[in-house]
């Protein structure tokens, strides 16, 4: 993942106390970038709470549908937490401490700030957690597709 790679570069710069390295400033944009999945749960929730999910005769299909949609819940929670972290970083650190006009070209030493270092570690962690949740969802979707294919072959 490109974002993890860039954050890892920042982290290495901080570990080496290479605060004047221009990469520290140029790569810091990756702290506020977020790519969301936005899973759509409405259809599944309507099926589940109305009892209509039981209309699917095949138990394997019902389970595959449920399992797939249930993998989306952790994604939604992780992405929400990640967004709150980004917003707090923006409001509590970037706005009061960084000149946006110079960001990316300046060698300001905000890399020495513990808030900045903590944010790098936090983002590395949240991105890794998101990746894990996405991978689980992808595997579940593959199983659902396989179940659909098996049903088509038997009908």
Predicted feature residues:
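Long, hydrophobic alpha-helical segments that serve as membrane-spanning/inserting helices
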Residues: 1-155
């Amino acid at each position: 993942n490109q974002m993890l790679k860039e954050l890892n570069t920042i982290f290495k710069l901080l570990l080496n106390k290479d605060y004047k390295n221009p990469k520290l400033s140029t790569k810091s944009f990756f702290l506020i970038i977020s790519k969301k999945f936005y899973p759509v749960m409405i259809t599944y929730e309507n099926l589940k709470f109305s009892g209509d999910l039981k209309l699917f005769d095949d138990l394997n299909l019902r389970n595959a549908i449920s399992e797939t949609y249930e993998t989306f819940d952790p994604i939604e929670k992780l992405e929400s937490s990640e967004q709150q972290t980004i917003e707090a970083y923006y409001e509590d650190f970037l706005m009061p401490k960084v000149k946006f006009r110079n960001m990316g070209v300046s060698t300001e030493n905000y890399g020495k700030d513990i808030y900045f270092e903590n944010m790098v570690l936090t983002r590395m962690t949240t991105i890794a957690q998101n990746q894990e949740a996405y991978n689980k969802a992808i595997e579940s979707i593959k199983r659902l597709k396989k179940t659909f294919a098996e049903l088509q072959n038997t009908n």
